[in-house]
Amino acid sequence: MAMKRIAVLNVVGLTRSVIDDMPRLREWSKKREVMSFKPAFPAVTCTAQSSYLTGKPVGEHGIVGNGWYDREDAEVKFWKQSNHLVKGKKVWEEAEVRCAKMFWWYNMYSSADFSATPRPLYPADGRKFFDI
């Protein structure tokens, strides 16, 4: 029996009410079962993704925001990438299945079978660009 494939699309602000305005996503979703997650709190990228990937609340996975103050180094650290920062087993580890984790945070040193790590670039004028 073939394993059921699952795709988790993490798109900020995407709700069922706007899928009809997106032709490709609308067609893709018509052929599949579409489900929603309860929004994570706080609603910031790193915390939300860590909650979705572990199934745990912030108090258990430990990622309280996109950055934190490091007392030892006396500096604020933003957008760190090591998967070792996220406490707890990931959903694919619990399910013992193969996983491709593409462009999510905390991808470095992840146990996912396939991954690509985002690398944002911040020019001095305040813009933000994504790269890999």
Describe each model-derived feature in a short phrase:
Residues 3-17, 52, 95:
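Beta-strand elements within well-structured catalytic alpha/beta cores of enzymes
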Residues 4, 41-44, 84-89:
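Short, exposed beta-strand "edge-strand" segments with a Pro/Gly-rich flavor and a Y/T-containing core
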Residues 7-11, 30-36, 44-49, 66-81:
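Glycine-/proline-rich flexible loop or hinge segments
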Residues 1-3, 22, 35, 102, ...:
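Detector for methionine-enriched segments
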Residues 56-132:
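His/Asp/Glu-rich, glycine-adjacent segments
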Residues 17-60, 100:
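Short, structured active-site-proximal loop/turn typified by the sulfatase FGly-forming signature C/S-X-P-X-R
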Residues 11, 26-29, 53, 89-93:
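Non-transmembrane alpha-helical segments in soluble domains
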